[in-house]
Curated annotation (Swiss-Prot):
Disulfide bonds: none annotated. Pfam families: FMO-like (PF00743), NAD_binding_8 (PF13450). Keywords: FAD, Flavoprotein, Monooxygenase, NADP, Oxidoreductase. GO terms for molecular function: flavin adenine dinucleotide binding; N,N-dimethylaniline monooxygenase activity; NADP binding; oxidoreductase activity, acting on paired donors, with incorporation or reduction of molecular oxygen, NAD(P)H as one donor, and incorporation of one atom of oxygen. Its EC number is 1.14.13.-. This is Baeyer-Villiger monooxygenase. The record marks R387 as: Transition state stabilizer. FAD binds at E94, T102, W103, Y104, W105, D114, Y120, V164. The keyword Acyltransferase does not apply. NADP(+) binds at H112, C113, D114, T248, G249, A250, T251, G252, V253, Q254, R271, T272, K386, R387. Catalyzes a Baeyer-Villiger oxidation reaction, i.e. the insertion of an oxygen atom into a carbon-carbon bond adjacent to a carbonyl, which converts ketones to esters or lactones using NADPH and/or NADH as an electron donor. Thus, can convert bicyclo[3.2.0]hept-2-en-6-one into the oxidative lactone products 2-oxabicyclo[3.3.0]oct-6-en-3-one and 3-oxabicyclo[3.3.0]oct-6-en-2-one. Is also able to catalyze the sulfoxidation of methyl phenyl sulfide (thioanisole).
Amino acid sequence: MAHAQELTPEALAGLRERYRRERERRVRPDGTRQYLGADAEFGFYAADPWAGESDVREPVRDRVDVAVVGGGFGGVLAGARLRQQGVARVRVVEKGGDFGGTWYWNRYPGIHCDIEAHVYLPMLDETGYVPEWKYAPGEEIRRHAMRIAETFDLYTDVLFSTAVTSLSWDDTTGEWIVETDRHDAFRATYVITATGVLSELKLPGIPGIERFKGHTFHTSRWDYAYTGGGPDGGLTGLADKRVGVVGTGATGVQVIPKLAEDAGQLHVFQRTPSSVDVRANRRTTARDVGADRAGWASERRDNFLRVVSGEAVEEDLVADRWTATAGLLEKLLPSFRRPDDLAAFEAAYEVADAARMNDIRARVDDLVTDPATADRLKPWYRYACKRPTFSDLYLQAFNRDNVTLVDTADTHGIERMNERGVVVGDTEYPLDCLVFATGFSVGVSGVHSGRLPVRGRGGVRLRDAWSARGPRTLHGLTSNGFPNLIQLGGVQSASSVNHTHVLDEHAVHGAALVAAAEAKGAVVEPTREAEDAWIATLAEHAPDHAWFHAECTPGYYNAEGRGRPNGPTAYPHGAAAFHELLRRWREESMDELLAPRARVRAC
């Protein structure tokens, strides 16, 4: 393995050139347009395989205090934090058949979370639950979302198998009208949107995809009726099948070992290899994590956030590969900025990055027996160009006689499909089943994309209000002209690799806003001046990431090779500082976000 001190200027120059060549092999002129949505003729890919037949019910026409759009962790946390604030009439609307969000939909074989369960699963202190595994399987995570909902009585008023189709502010009554695909039209004083950033599955736009006569499905709607087995494997229905899988990101890294165990033949179609580090999962006990202490989970979660944000701590409580590479993770977070010599920092960072990636590539050689296959599995890009993955099974799966790796980089993916299978280059691969592990339209909620129309004061659409100059918010949560609308997990806030922590802080803040508005008979709405000040704060310290992502291999981090824009898109000082800012705001400045309910004009 190459270490930092062995990386000469010549070696670094060679790496840069290799990274450039590998990037050029994969960049497509159509960018993000290469993907299809699961609608129109492809709508069957998004059908709910878990809910069964929807209950027949009459349309809902009543009124609640708060409508929460989305029943994933964001929505569950919003409901729970509202309950803690004493809000009684809370209704969650969720298109799935139960709580869980992405963990409701994704139940594919091998699914786990890559963040330690004791920091990823929220409200462990409040529910008294201690995770069974360091990295929890999907079923444990989904059941915890349900546990929170049960603990805080969210099942009392919930509309499952129901999608919100529009949110409209009534200027006359000062309420939101919530309409759904089941003809509901109820009213709410407040709306909290928690539609998530992993909710819209995507498919590869392969020419002829509709011609294939075999079986197909997306990993987020796994078809166990066809494959047999369950999340732990045992896919006996594939024993005599020729199976293909498209996608080798976080989902593919988990599902491919399970498919390899049970499929008659498995073809893995890979455009870009993931970086695959050690997982080292294990069962855990309450004693392992100090769960006998009050507040243990919050302490551990805060400790993890500080470590991956590059802050100094007395002890790294989680002590895993995320925290070990904390210095590199600063590139993933908007906290990266140095007041001193930026050029010197970048040079040192490049050396550390190269050493880390050399170690990851060396691990491929250690675990994959065929040199040609090993070479195709090596990630030739910088560490933060793609979300890292972790597995102790994935690379070894390619040593099996029934597994074939098909490199599609030079053809920019699968070239076409026909009735029999897929075509790459001059080779046709006949298949009985093709699994799409192609992920989601990451980072774009239904509200921001316009798929969920939101109309505020005077009927102005949120998307139209933001079309000219981009998003306008205070803290990423509230917007002028859209009173009593609180958006969780949105732009212009802070991000973290542990997304549930961010969602929980948003939920705590949103619930506090609702409680304060109720106590004062006010509406939650920032002034335009408050928005301007917040955007100026973001812009003043906005990090220059555009050059970095423009040089990365294509993926969802950089809009498939287009780079990411600079500007006020996220809080620049990191999630830990942002959470502290929200706490101070609640203590000192809450009244600045409250306006008299009688106000009907934007100020």
